[in-house]
Amino acid sequence: MAVPKRRTSKTRKNKRRTHFKISVPGMTECPNCGREYKLSHRVCKNCGSYNGEEVAAK
């Protein structure tokens, strides 16, 4: 069975983990009402529009 010869140092462990990070969500200003930021490809909570059309009644 494979066993590590030496203990992994904190520096080596942290260098390996540099890519494990949370990315910022893509927020855009609503083109219809312009008052609220919304996630991309989702309905605006303020005006209920998506892709220039009203899809959710307020």
UniProtKB/Swiss-Prot annotation:
Pfam families: Ribosomal_L32p (PF01783). SUPFAM superfamilies: Zn-binding ribosomal proteins (SSF57829). InterPro entries: Ribosomal_bL32, Ribosomal_bL32_bact, Ribosomal_zn-bd. GO terms for molecular function: structural constituent of ribosome. The keyword Ribosomal protein applies. GO terms for cellular component: large ribosomal subunit. GO terms for biological process: translation. It comes from the Bacteria. Keywords: Ribonucleoprotein, Ribosomal protein. NCBIfam families: rpmF_bact. Belongs to the bacterial ribosomal protein bL32 family. This is Large ribosomal subunit protein bL32. The lineage of its organism: Bacteria, Bacillati, Bacillota, Bacilli, Bacillales. The gene is rpmF.
